[in-house]
Amino acid sequence: MEPRLRVFELARELGVDSKRVLEVLQSLNVDVKNHMSTIDQKTAEKVTDAVRRTEAQEGQGAGKSAAKSAKPAAQPKPTREANPAKTSLLEDFFGSGTRPQRPLSEKRERRPLTERRPLAERRPLAERPLVDRPVTERPLAERPAAELRPGAAKAAAPARPAAEAQPVAERRAPAEAAQAAQAERRPAEKAQPAAAAKAAPPEKAGAAPVPGAVAEQKQAATPAAAEQKPAGKAEQTAGAAQAKPARAEAGTGASSRPASAAPAAQGEKRPAAAAERREEPQAEAPQTSGPSRPVPAGPGQPARPAGSGIGVPVKPAAGGKSGLGLPTRPGEKAADGARGGGSGIGLPVKPAAGQGTAARAGGLGLPQKPKAGAPRPGGGLGAPQRPGRRGAPLAIPKLDPKVAEQAKAGEGKPRYGQSGDKRRADLYDRREHPSSQPSEEKLFGQRPKRKASAQERRVLKPITVTGPMSVKDLAHEMGVTAAEVIKTLLTGFGIMATINQELDVDTCVLVASEFGVEATVEQKEDIIEVYDRVEDPDEPAELKKPRHPVVTIMGHVDHGKTSLLDAIRQAKVAAGEAGGITQHIGAYEVELNGRKITFLDTPGHEAFTAMRARGANVTDIAVLVVAADDSVMPQTVESINHAKAANVPILVAINKIDKPEANPQRVMQDLTQYGLVPEEWGGDTIMVPVSAKQKTNLDLLLENILVLAEVSDLKANPDKPAAGTILEAALDKARGPVATVLVQAGTLNTGDVFVAGTSWGRVRAMFDHRGRKLKSAGPSTPVRVLGFDSVPQAGDVFRVTPDEKTARAIAEKRIAKAQAERLAQKAISLDDFMNQVAQGEIKDLNVIVKADVQGSVEAIRGQLEKLRNEEVKVKVIHAGVGAISESDVMLAVASKAIIIGFNVRPDDRASRAADEHGIDVRTYSVIYDIVDDIEAAMKGMLKPKIEEVILGKAEVRETFKVPKVGMAAGCMVIQGKVTRNARYRLIRDGVVVWDGEINALRRFKDEVREVSEGYECGITLQNFHDFKRGDILEAYELQEIKAG
């Protein structure tokens, strides 16, 4: 949308009241309400032209009266003076490049020049008093401007010593100048647009004359020059020039061009900007007749040509170079030491060396950046002329229809069409006026260059796809916008995606190919998979150091595993176990001859199969304990299978050899059936007969364990972040979640951040198996760790992470993955369950399990899930660690479940809630008791067996019709009895024709409950009336027979 400008902003730039602009708008039939209304570019230009035209007409009479008056004119208002630090808003709006035929920056510089607007109409030139000035009486015929302005050139009388060098006879009268200008006006009009845009060597101009130079110039001025100076100008002093430097009218471009008091030498180089414009092709301006006047710069200095306000070069005449200064506004004083003011569109000229900054040649009428130590002069819009060429200030082209026609026809070149001028002006604006820079979309200006589209900005370089990527990331990698990727997915693949939706690898490759980008698939290892491993397979072997072995005690129930370990480590552990059965993994360290051995005690019965499997995976040597009196049992076989699956060497300890019925040879014979051949029989399995009770051969057992460890060459790298396995986890009311961790690689230190499964945390404290606090733990060391955010799962991999952010991210990803898997499983099982319920094939016994440690929870869950038969199964809907809470009771209420607690008790609130809702809460200390009770409950829930009992039979002897009832059958009970509430089936020729209930059973006219054998009765059936003689009505009922 085209930018718009408010009325009060336009009025402020035009220097008039908003009311006046509103009147002009109303006269132009533009619908505006107040000064806050907005107008477009064309309307603003129309208003600007109308206001200028009106001001010019009003100021024409004022200019003439001011010329006739000998009294010096009043100083212009401060608001009319140029402000070098300000950039016109209209210039921002109508800057270069928006109107090639006439940049609006000219309008900005012409704004305060209201009296001089119709200068082209004021003729003859004799009416202007400014012709009496010494330098302004040049023949105007030499000015190739489109419109010659009478008395257009003014000189700073006292500052210009050129009066001595110029003969009075050469100064033409205004009438002569007008006649000469009339002859050359037409060719000048054609050359003016192109010439105005070209840069000639700039005329030297000082922003503020140095006092010393001003004094020298005053001494060099001739009496004739002083006589020709108007009375109103004679009062100007050098002091005034020092106090107030010559400034340009910023709104109009009129500039008082101070002459250079000490011009540079003839060989001085021009600025780069002027040099660039000199090299550009210039339209030849017509040569003018009449003598040219050199402008001496000072005593002993070579003369420099004077530049015209419009930059139209004039060929120099013989004898020197000449130039013409630009006139100031009527009634305005020129500063001493400065040349007469320029026209409304002139540019200040280049100063001599040491005299300040020259106006940029061919510039945009903006204030120029001063050199060091010199004030900024005002700037105009014209370009300085070439040496020796004269020119006159260009009249406002808006009022000249010929200039407009030339611009429309393309004859003239835009003044600011040169890219160099525009680039230099824009650069100056950015340096000097950062606050006045227009926005990207210039108001009333040309649309900025279109940014390169995503298609153009695309870098067609290969990308690497390491995994699923979101639409946003894929678009960023390819250098396109997300909208393009979404569009391609929809149109090319029919996928409706959002910006954050993840795309799989194959889709990413296909989308990249649609954009012409080569995609390489590189499978990046998932961070979860990295932290799921304990050992690094790529770790160099030279970094590993020897470590002590980890030994697992395995075997059948009550074969003496814990007793043997207790005997080894000299601690009474078995006495603390409920029922003498180990309930969860214990990890202990023993030392023999300075060498350590870590023992893991795993429960032996089949309920702890999963725990035993984990124990086998973390161990180096498996000690299989077999009782000499029981020999091989089912759990013994299972232990052998787990050890072989984990590739763990097995050492057999034949326990209880002190018993009279012990038979070690039988044990060895039975083990050979499972691939364990003793060394005595030529095998490779070490078998040691021991007695845990008598502590027989314990040292021999330990020595053999160390021998196997040496053969296995156990090594680990202790100089890396720790990694291990969670052996056991529990929730301690005082210390929170606590876990037993076996460090398998690296060194675990207090303060390390870790992740284990879906839990993470920081090591707050570590304790060994004796309860001593540790600061670090190396490989093969079991420790109890505090600092988990939640209770981890037994068997989870424990890994130290670089920071908490990484640990939290891994845990959250694992939680999300587990939830997704659980939801998927629930969806499938729910569908199956609903089908089974609809068919009446299955029933569930919902159970909530709470235990003291995670290992017990898993053991109970596994044991209960095995308790099922053809019609009933146990469904564990929740299992956790800790005391039975009120939330567990509420869950049991909602799911109609029973609560089982193992080594835990319900709290007070949970007990009250259970009593209130009638929830069955049972607590146990031995797992086998749980199994027995659940089996009994399942028997009570078995679907009862339905048996059909025949009550009696009746034969249809007669049929008759009963009003309002239908057909009735007159029957004779031939067997048993028939009752009112029994079910009946109608049998005809051995085929059941109908089955259902009867409507009525009558004997004569009375309703009866039953009719015995040998009696007659009348029977009507529900929805059946087609009785026939000989049909048999069989009465029966269904009875439930409970399973024993």
UniProtKB/Swiss-Prot annotation:
- Mark out the compositionally biased spans (Basic and acidic residues): 104-146, 267-281, 399-444
Instruction: Give the span(s) annotated as G1.
Output: 555-562
Stretch list, region G3:
601-604
Q: At which positions is GTP bound?
A: 555-562, 601-605, 655-658
| Matching InterPro entries | EF-G-like_DII, IF2_II, IF2_N, P-loop_NTPase, Small_GTP-bd, T_Tr_GTP-bd_dom, TF_IF2_bacterial-like, TIF_IF2
**UniProt entry tagged with the keyword S-adenosyl-L-methionine:** no
The record's region (G5) falls at 691-693
Cite the tr-type G domain residue spans from the record: 546-714
Q: Region labeled G4 — which residues?
A: 655-658
Instruction: List compositional bias (Low complexity) regions by residue number.
Output: 57-77, 147-168, 190-231, 254-265, 352-375, 383-395
Task: Give GO terms: molecular function aspect only.
Answer: GTP binding; GTPase activity; translation initiation factor activity
Where do the segments described as Disordered lie? 55-458
GO CC list: cytosol
Summarizing the function annotation, the protein's role is: One of the essential components for the initiation of protein synthesis. Protects formylmethionyl-tRNA from spontaneous hydrolysis and promotes its binding to the 30S ribosomal subunits. Also involved in the hydrolysis of GTP during the formation of the 70S ribosomal complex.
Name assigned to this protein: Translation initiation factor IF-2
UniProt source species = Symbiobacterium thermophilum (strain DSM 24528 / JCM 14929 / IAM 14863 / T)
